[in-house]
């Protein structure tokens, strides 16, 4: 059983929901990410999603795009992100870490670091670093069968996005290859946009669960404890990204970790 699966299993037995914060690796300071990850765990995070900066992030809203641009300007690429996970793992061997990003940096990493037709350098190095799951926004499920199998061989999960526009056929395709959890994007459009319609989310989840047997996390548009609590009543996990980025983007270095921790404590208290 993967670390993600055992985390969800433990939470389910306690009747609790997973809190999954997202931060862009290397933001707002190049070297702050491992410390920020530890502070989010202290605030109640069950799984951490780490965004891999990319120059053309089609699914990200302006807040996360801007964070990615800053991280890229600070020299953060996939190799640096894996090093951050290694550093985090020196003190935390239990909290699952998911890398969220796009196909291009993964493919470039494989070319640069000696991937072959039978082995992906990215998968090898991610497993060694202590990564638990991968969410590649622009990898369609029908093209991911082999990638998913290679990840599973290293005890890593392949996580997919589902949207309000996802058809039953698409959900069935995702169910074939997804493991760990699926991430339901509760708004049409890009991350951090608009307000959340909890009733619409609640109506959609039974449809998703007909097809998908892994836990369902809901994100995009969750900004406060009240919304998190409402979503937590219907979903297995609450994912929060843009709001955390906004809270930390203008903080002095010594305040970043505490601001993130204190915000997550509020969300955790509401979920529990």
Curated annotation (Swiss-Prot):
Give any GO molecular function from the UniProt entry: tryptophan synthase activity
Q: Does the keyword Zinc apply?
A: no
One GO cellular component assignment for this chain's record is: cytosol
Species of origin: Polaromonas sp. (strain JS666 / ATCC BAA-500)
Sorted alphabetically, which Pfam families does this protein's record hold? Trp_syntA
Q: What family is this?
A: Belongs to the TrpA family.
Q: Which InterPro entries match?
A: Aldolase_TIM (IPR013785), RibuloseP-bd_barrel (IPR011060), Trp_synthase_suA (IPR002028)
- CDD domains cross-referenced by the UniProt entry: Tryptophan_synthase_alpha
Q: What does the protein in this record do?
A: The alpha subunit is responsible for the aldol cleavage of indoleglycerol phosphate to indole and glyceraldehyde 3-phosphate.
EC no. given is 4.2.1.20
Q: What is this protein called?
A: Tryptophan synthase alpha chain
